[in-house]
């Protein structure tokens, strides 16, 4: 039964995983859509190869061949972190940049963080909790978007207006897939599956309503879709550890804060999916909700608010450090490899020209 449950979660997440690149690619000019989708596909392929050849084993200390299904489920978590920062990476306008960066980022940032929190690493032993990726997936993605935006700021294009139908459809696919995203770490539907589903819906409703009220400068469809995405992101850190009342308050707070940040900084960052504001806000507010409102029956025995606050804040600090340093190193290495490739290619072209 556990294998069938994991398979169902894996299949449900597939449309969600590919809807984010679709939304990001369509925010650029129509002439760039095909290229952007191709770049996204290359990046997903490169990161998947890195995960299968060593990333999973390093993160979870298990061989890929021993039990392939968890490898694929965890791969989707890693890839979702990557596609959320895709919109920023597309601004580099170099086809080989994102595939190189994706593979390096997965090994230098995602794998160490996943090991520390989900692979029985030091932060997990310290008592830090992260149910379905508030820190592992969303905080790493949001902070990496910050690194990329700062590096690529002068190259960022003017984004095209969002199409309400495209945005709504993409959001529906993400919402549907998120049930698999939040349920997969539970391992089975019972006993906590119904609560996880309820908390996911509550987070979406409260964050969506908060966005609708707090961001009057945006179209209503955009506000609701952004609110849904914020609620989904916020739910991940605590969805299996709290009751619906705590989730409602957490979703409301996250929606209000994220709406203000996007309203104020969207034109500054020019990120098609507002990864920095939504992911970082959702992750940090989710951690705060977990510390203040966890249900003692849903967390490890003996957990106290003070102890959890210490372990969670330590985890946040460690994840921030690993992400900022690892992302910058991955960026430098990607740029260096591209520069070397261009020089070698230029030499080869000159040699062929002389021979002709």
Where are the regions a protein language model picked out?
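Glycine- and aromatic-enriched membrane alpha-helices
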Residues: 1-356
């Amino acid at each position: 039964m556990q294998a069938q449950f994991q398979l169902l979660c894996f299949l449900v997440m597939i449309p969600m995983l590919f809807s984010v690149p679709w939304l990001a690619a369509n925010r650029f000019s129509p002439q760039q859509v095909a290229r952007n989708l191709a770049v996204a596909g290359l990046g997903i392929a490169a990161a998947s190869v890195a995960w299968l050849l060593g990333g999973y084993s390093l993160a979870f200390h298990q061989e890929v061949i021993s039990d392939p299904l968890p490898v694929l489920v965890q791969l989707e978590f890693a890839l979702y972190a990557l596609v959320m920062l895709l919109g920023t990476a597309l601004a580099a306008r170099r086809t080989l940049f994102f595939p190189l960066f994706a593979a390096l980022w997965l090994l230098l940032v995602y794998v160490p963080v996943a090991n520390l929190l989900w692979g029985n690493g030091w932060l997990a032993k310290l008592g830090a909790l992260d149910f379905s990726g508030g820190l592992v997936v969303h905080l790493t993605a949001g902070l990496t978007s910050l690194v990329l935006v700062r590096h690529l700021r002068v190259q960022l294009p003017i984004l095209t207006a969002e199409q309400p139908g495209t945005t709504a459809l993409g959001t529906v696919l993400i919402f549907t897939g998120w049930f698999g995203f939040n349920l997969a770490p539970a391992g089975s539907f019972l006993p906590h599956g119904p609560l996880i589903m309820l908390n996911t819906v509550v987070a979406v409703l409260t964050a969506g309503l908060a966005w609708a009220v707090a961001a009057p400068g945006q179209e209503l469809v955009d506000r609701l879709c952004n609110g849904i995405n914020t609620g989904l992101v916020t739910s991940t850190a605590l969805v299996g550890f709290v009751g619906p009342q705590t989730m409602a308050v957490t979703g409301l707070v996250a929606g209000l804060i994220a709406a203000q940040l996007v309203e104020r900084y969207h034109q500054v960052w020019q990120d098609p999916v507002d990864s920095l504001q939504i992911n970082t806000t959702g992750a940090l507010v989710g951690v705060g909700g977990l510390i203040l409102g966890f249900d003692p029956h849903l967390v490890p025995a003996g957990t106290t608010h003070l102890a959890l606050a210490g372990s969670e804040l330590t985890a946040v600090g460690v994840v921030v450090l690993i992400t900022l340093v690892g992302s910058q190193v991955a960026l430098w290495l990607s740029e260096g490899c591209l520069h070397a490739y261009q020089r070698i290619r230029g030499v080869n072209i000159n040699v062929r020209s002389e021979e002709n």
